[in-house]
Amino acid sequence: MRLYVGVHLKITKRFFIILICFVFALCLIIQTGCNSDDSITPITIRFWHTYTGKQRDIFAMLVDTYNTTEGKSRNVFVVAEYKTQEEITNYLETAFSSQASSVEYPEITFISKESAYKANMHNLVVNAEKYLSKQELKGYFDGFMKEGQIAGTDETFVFPISKTSSVTIINDSMWRQFYVDENVKLKQWETWSGINSLAEKYYQWSNGRALIAFESVEDFIFTYSAQQLPPLVQTGNKEIRINTNKETLRGIWDFYYSGVINGYILQTDNVLESLEQGKIVAYLGEPHDMTFFPKKYINFNGENSTFLITSALYPTINDSRKVYPQKGNGVSVFNHGEEINQASYDFLHWLCSNENVIQFSVANNEISSFQPIYEKKSTEQFFKQLSVFNYKKHQILSNSLHQVTEGKTYSPTGFVEYDSFCEEITHSLIDISSKALSEVHGYEKEGFTHQQAVKMVDTEDRFKIWYENVLAIANKY
């Protein structure tokens, strides 16, 4: 009996030892598995952006969504860092100058056209065509993509997320008074010749007031050149050309210079103030929220009246070539190796094709770059709600969207000292027109009629002076 008990105890003891070893081994296996998962460091993508306000909040929400869904499954984590455009440009320009190998670049950053061109010269950025499929790229608006093709090829180094497309913003209260009396049509706003005809009639009807102002004369110059062809800045065959076609420049001159000296176009740095004071009926410029516009304006009797707003498409030369302006910096992906580059473009495509990107772009009155988004039912429903709760914003955005989807949009690609080139070209036209207008006022004080004074400065010699100035500027770059 004792022997039996002893054997039984030995077997029981051995069983417990085996059981403990088994449990311990199982724990080790589980722990090893956990450690294995934890040891996989996620790919971190730093994204330097410039978004503010509501758009910044929505962007943060989109990034969080990605990190907890698609990014998590791909083991990718996006870190959004806010910086001003000036901070980004200064950092990049300093880095380009130093050419130090120790410089750290973000994986993705908002970037100016000029900085992007320089980054590409240093082989620091990678193009979208290498990492996104043809089918994926096909969905992006052509004009948005072409602006980022800074090497004179079909390779996109500045990737678009969203952009604005300028329209014509009209003081509907003043416009209604004018068109009732003069039997003019809203459709006349859609062409340069139509606006010129409106401006001439309005000048007489209003006793010498300007019809329009430009929020950006630069946008007018480059858009008009693209409408007429050839554009002032043209890419292709691995080069960037500055075209100084005399006929194209003549068209720009005839509308702007003649418009200013005749009193049809108001030169101003503050279109909002000009609207509020009743100095203009409309301006050509970027869409804005309704909070941007005045609630009252000074009417023809010098009294405060309610400011009502309507909008029209940005003017074109004719219906056969509808080219409209676009504006807004894109992003560049800096080279950090194939895996990170691919992850960066995967995130960008996810962002642009996510249905919530519509709320993000509309927050800043922009058009999202990925066209299929606008075919989604959720987008249709969003715009229906917008038309109910903010009809005027809906109308302005609808005009912008129409320009992008039904026409073509254009903004020149960048190059070294691109910003300086644009500034010089723009101010050359503004300055010569401003000086001529001062001469007109001087002649009027001397007793000449307005028509006589205009005729004295509206000469072929003036155009030749400007044309030679443009040639000199172009030859510098």
Task: Please state what every model-predicted region is.
Residues 151-161, 166-168, 176, 193-241:
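Extracytoplasmic/periplasmic solute-binding protein
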Residues 129-140, 185-187, 230-251, 299-303, ...:
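Short, solvent-exposed loop/beta-turn-alpha elements that line the ligand-binding surface or hinge
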Residues 196-202, 235-269, 309-310, 314:
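Glycine-centered hinge/linker elements that transmit conformational signals in sensory
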Residues 1-45, 461, 465-477:
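Short, low-complexity disordered leader/linker segments with a strong preference
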Residues 300-372:
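Extracytoplasmic/periplasmic substrate-recognition and gating elements
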Residues 109-167, 306-315:
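Hinge/lid segment of periplasmic solute-binding proteins
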Residues 42-46, 50-116, 273:
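Early extracytoplasmic/lumenal segment of secretory-pathway proteins
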